[in-house]
Structures are given as structure tokens and as C-alpha cells.
């Protein structure tokens, strides 16, 4: 027990300490691609983590403390293809360090202060194509043991301490070398012996970068008969004289691409004289680029004479001022002028020029016509140019133009429908201000146009024929514009070959049902950043080839259930994020559809509810159908309850007095009646009731007590309550005096209906009908129930004659005596006049 207690006492603090350690200390690397790519950058590692899988192909160990790389250091990763060891403070690399990495193609050693590099350090790297050894304290290429890397294509040893340009003999064993970067070293002189290996074993695909080396001298003839793919000399010369002599030292060089000049932040030359380029006459060049040279001195008319036969010339950030140097008819086929300083637009006349790029230039606002008859590609973007009456072949001096980019300029007024430019395939106006585009069919003649960009051109589309003639168009971008009434009309009728359409940020609220009917080839449709309120899938039903649909950043609440089936079957990518979804049971089918279509919907997890308030900013996927089932149950129960209450209320309201009568029957059912009969009659017949009925019955023998409303009803009590409580409940029988006035009186009919109920509820009750006068059958049939009763039952009919009166009163008294408790007097009187009642129908 004591031993166990001691063990527990020791383990508890240890466990506490371990629990405080970060989980990264056990598994430090970030898994970028499972079992393939791992990033272990800046983790203070002193060795390679043991838990990295053997299948790893990309491993980043940069910014650690590996310091010493021993033999077979990476043999656990035979599949490795890319290894980054940048700035790991590596000082020693032993023999066979990378042995076994037969698939490694890229090795990066940047920023390591290597002091000892064994001759067999790079053995085993039979597939290595790129080796980066920037800032590795390398002093000479002779000390770099790479002669066996026959597949090496790129060697970057920039920013070291190499003083000699001498290329070792082993370069003859690197036949695939394409790029050698020696920039920012300490090379000052280049001699013929330095490049002897290039004379013996030409590397025709080699591009050589010597920028930022303090060159002072190049021995004449050094590069004679040498062929290079490219040579870059930027920020190399401290004076104009040195530059001139060094360029002359390149005489005899044949290169596909030559780059001269300086870097933006590495300026050494104060002035640039046209004579600097005279030495280029002794070189054979296909492409020439000059960058960041300004303050030209002297006449620059003949500046480019030595470049007359160059195919491609590029001027980057050059301040020429005068344009005389560009006004000659050189044989250039490709001219780039980027971010240069000119007084005015160059009026070029280059008969061979096929491609002209003139972008980001300063202080030029007015376009000037030029003559370029062979021109096919023209890029004039970002110059703040204005065009009046654009565009026709006379503006550019060519009828062969296929690519025209006028984007990011000022105002462009369309004055013609591109006459003479029928071969155009690419046209870009984005972020320029287009005018008069609604005046006529500006693109009518462009039947070969495949790409059109009029995005953010400040146009409001009114003219429905704006795209007439564009029968070959495949890509149309028109984002950031607007439409009349914010409605997208049917303007794409002729665009049957369209595959990409961008309508984002067009303030669209509605889309015509036939807007996309002609676009059966459309594959990509961008409807984002508009004001659409619903996902109307009927619009997209004709788009049989549609693969990508972006409806993000709208105001879509939902889509109708029956419409969701109309989305094209070809659709593979649908973006509905950033909309105002209504997560309510009304749209339950749509919300369920969102859950079912997660593979189709991009960013389904980012689809948020906008309403109701209790679900605002919650994911649409969090909506639960059970909520709707519960709500439906509650609603159903509530509806049924309301209906039942309503029905009961209506029945109670309709039969309120009948219920009162029923309650009274139970209350007074066993008591004695006060009245012999309750008389129901019309006020129009009150004289007959007073003078005949009351006088003969109450003053006759035997006397009968009648209940009359004008005499026996209690004041202050509702008429209906008096009728039931004083009339029916306290009377043995009911006398109904039927006349034309009775039939037409609502109160009389009401009293009669209550009397029927009273007769049904009380076994002793009886109704005696007295018909005062002959009634028209048409009038009597208006009261169906009364008509039926009078047709089937015995009633008394009043006749104003001596015999008729005698018979009437005898029969009425007999009817009233039925069920009446007999008194001795009443019995004797009744026996003196025994008579039978006669029936009249």
C-alpha cells in the first residue's frame, strides 16, 4: 500500500505537467495534404519529427535549428519530391545526407550559413531539377559539388560571395540546365577562360542572370559564337563608360532575350546616353527589354537603330520625352511600352508590328491615330485615354485586328460599329466610360467576336438590340452596369454560342422569363451581388449546359418547392451564400432541399438565416423539420379547437332561447301552471284577442286564465325572457292566432318556433292553432314548417257567424280543458254542455 501511494504521489505531478504541454509538442507539423504534404516551419525543431509518414512528398522544415545534417538524414522519406530547408542554421552537410531521395525534384537551402559541404553531400539526387542555394556563404562554383546532377534545370546561387564567373568543367555534365542565377554576387570581371566550357559544350537553353554584380570589365570576344536563351544585366554598372565597354564586350553573342537596365530601387546610372546601345549592333537578339532608365541626353533619333531587326522590344519605365526614336519603320513584330513618360501618344508607323502593348503610361489623355497595317493585338489599358467616334479601322490603321483592350481608360464614345474590324475576337472596355451604346447596334459587324467585356462602363441598358450581330460570342462580362426598371430583358437572342455570362452587381430585381431561352450552350452564369428576392429556377431551365451558377449576395428568401426540380441536370456548382433566407416552415421544402444538396451547394455551411429573429445569423442547415411538425400539430389542434368553439358558439347563439326553454322545463317541469294558455298573436290582431278571445274565455264558464304579453309580462325583463319564463314555463298550452299579420311578423314566428321546442320538451304541452282568416297558400308557403303543421294537424278556424261562433268556442274550451285539473264546479258545468270538437282543414 505504501509503495502504491508513493507511485501515485509521483505520477500526479507528472500528469499535471504533461497536461500543460501543448499538443503540438507531440505532433508539431501541420498536415497540408494528408500523407502527402507537411509544414513544419518555425517550430524550433532540432531534428526531423518521427511521426511524419513515409509517403510524404512535400516537406517544409524551414526556420528551425537542424544545424548538422548527417548521412542518410532523410532516408525515411523515399517518396519525397520537394524539400525546403530554408534558414535552418545548417552549417554542416555530410556525405550521403540526401541518399535515397531518388524522386526529389526541388531542394531549397536558402539562408543557411554552410561551413562544411561534403563532396558527396548531394549524392543520390538523380531526379533533382531545381537547387536553390541563395545566401549559403558560397565563394566559388568550383566548391559546389553538383557535377553529377545531370537532370538539373535550375541553379540559383544568388546573393553569395562568388567573385569569379568561371564556370567549372562539370557544367558540361549539366546538359539540361536552363537557368543559372548568379545575381547579387561579387563578380567584377568576365574573361574568355571563364566561359570556355560554353564554347566546348553549348547550353542553348541556358538563361543567365548576372544582375546586381559590380561588373567593371568583359573581355572582348568572351561571348563570341556563344548562344544563350537569355542574358540579364540590371543594375550592374557604376558609370556610363563601364556600361558602354561591357556591352561592347558582349560582341558576337547570340541570345533569344537580352534584358538591360536597372531595378526600381537600385539606381546607379545618373544619365543614359544613346551611345550606350551602340554596342548592341554586334549582337544577335530576338527579344530586347530595357527597364528603369531615364534622363536621356542628346538626340535619341537613332537610339534603337541597332535594334532594327529585333522581333520583340519592351520598354519599361523609360523616360524618352521625344518620340523620334519610335517613328522609324523598324521590323519589330512585338512592341511593349509600359509605365513610360511621353509628351503625347506615339504616332507609330510600323508595317511589321503585329502586337502593340501600351499600358500604364503617364500624362497621355488623347488618342492619336497610327498606321500599323499588320497589327493583330492591341492593348491600350490604363492610360486615361479618351476616344471620340470609336472605333473603326482608320483609328488603328489596320483591318487585321483580333485583340483590342481599351479597359481602364476615360470616356469612350462609340461613333461607328467597328467597320473594318470584322476580324476582332477579343474586345475589352471594362472600367472605361462607354457612351452612345444604346444609340445603335454598335457590335453589328463583329460576327467573329468571342470575348466581350463591358463591365463597370457606367451604362444603363435600354436598347434591346445592343448585342445584335454577336453570333460567335462565347464570353460576355457586363458586371457593374444597370438595366431599365432593374429588369433583365430578352437581349441575348443571337448569343447562341455563349458559354460564360457575368451579370453581377447589375442591381437586378427581376429577370424576364425568356431572358435565357437562347443560351443553351451557357456553362457559367454569375448573378451575384444583385437584388433578386427568390431563386426562380424556371429561368435557368433552358440552360442545358450550365455547370456553374453564382447567386450569392442577393436577397433570396427561398424557392418554391415545385421550382426546385427545374435546375439543369448539368449543374455542378451553385453558390447561394450571403442571402436573406427565411427559415420558416412555409419554406420547409426549400430548407430540406438545401440539406439534401450539400454537394451541389458551395459553402452550404455559410448560408445563414435572416428571419425569423430567433434564427437570425444561424446556419440554414441548423433548421429542424421537427419544429414544423410540432408547429403543424399545434396549429391543427388550435384550428380544430377554434372551429369547435365557433360551432358551439354559433349553435348556442342560434338555439340560445331553446336552451333557456330546456333549462326552464327542468326547473318548472314538476310545478303547477299558472295560466291555462299562453297566447301568441300579432299586435295587429290585438283587438280580436281582447274583445273576443279574452272576453269569452276568461269571463266564460268554466273560466280560463290566459297569459297575454301586454298584461302579464314583467316590465324591465327582456321580451324573449318574458316569452319563455312567463309565457311557456307558466302555461299549460299555447294558443297561436294565425293571420296574415302573424306570418309577416318575425317576433310571431320566433315565438312559434319556441313553442314547437316547448311542445317537444314538455309531455303535457299542447299547441292550439286558430286561423282568423283565409290565408293565401303562396303567403303561407313562405313559412314551410307552419304550412306543413297546418296541413297535417287539426286547427280552429274563426267564423264570424252565430253558428260558427258557437262551434268555435265549444271546441276551443274542450281543447283547453284537456289536461286541466278539474274542480267540482268546473266538472259540473262541463257536464251540462258535453259536445264534440269538429275538425276543419
Curated annotation (Swiss-Prot):
Pfam family of the protein (one): LRR_8
InterPro entries reported for this sequence: Cys-rich_flank_reg_C (IPR000483), Leu-rich_rpt (IPR001611), Leu-rich_rpt_4 (IPR025875), Leu-rich_rpt_typical-subtyp (IPR003591), LRR_dom_sf (IPR032675), TIR_dom (IPR000157), Toll-like_receptor (IPR017241), Toll_tir_struct_dom_sf (IPR035897)
UniProt record, GO biological process: defense response to Gram-negative bacterium; detection of lipopolysaccharide; inflammatory response; innate immune response; macrophage activation; MyD88-dependent toll-like receptor signaling pathway; positive regulation of interleukin-1 beta production; positive regulation of NLRP3 inflammasome complex assembly
Region: Disordered, residue numbers: 820-841
Record-annotated TIR domain positions: 673-816
Principal location: membrane
Subcellular location field: Cell membrane; Early endosome; Cell projection, Ruffle
Domain of life, per lineage: Eukaryota
Spans within the Extracellular topological domain: 24-632
S-S pairs: 29-40, 281-306, 390-391, 583-609, 585-628
Keyword Glycoprotein: yes
Transmembrane regions listed in the UniProt entry: 633-653
LRR repeat ranges, renumbered to this chain: 55-76, 79-100, 103-124, 127-148, 151-172, 176-197, 205-225, 352-373, 374-394, 400-422, 423-444, 448-469, 472-495, 497-518, 521-542, 545-568
Post-translational modification: Phosphorylated on tyrosine residues by LYN after binding lipopolysaccharide. Ubiquitinated by RNF128 via 'Lys-28'-linked polyubiquitin chains, leading to proteasomal degradation.
Cytoplasmic membrane side: 654-841
GO molecular function, one term: NAD+ nucleosidase activity, cyclic ADP-ribose generating
Subunit text: Belongs to the lipopolysaccharide (LPS) receptor, a multi-protein complex containing at least CD14, LY96 and TLR4. Binding to bacterial LPS leads to homodimerization. Interacts with LY96 via the extracellular domain. Interacts with MYD88 and TIRAP via their respective TIR domains. Interacts with TICAM2. Interacts with NOX4. Interacts with CNPY3 and HSP90B1; this interaction is required for proper folding in the endoplasmic reticulum. Interacts with MAP3K21; this interaction leads to negative regulation of TLR4 signaling.
Family: Belongs to the Toll-like receptor family.
Function: Transmembrane receptor that functions as a pattern recognition receptor recognizing pathogen- and damage-associated molecular patterns (PAMPs and DAMPs) to induce innate immune responses via downstream signaling pathways. At the plasma membrane, cooperates with LY96 to mediate the innate immune response to bacterial lipopolysaccharide (LPS). Also involved in LPS-independent inflammatory responses triggered by free fatty acids, such as palmitate, and Ni(2+). Mechanistically, acts via MYD88, TIRAP and TRAF6, leading to NF-kappa-B activation, cytokine secretion and the inflammatory response.
Protein name: Toll-like receptor 4
Source species: Bos taurus
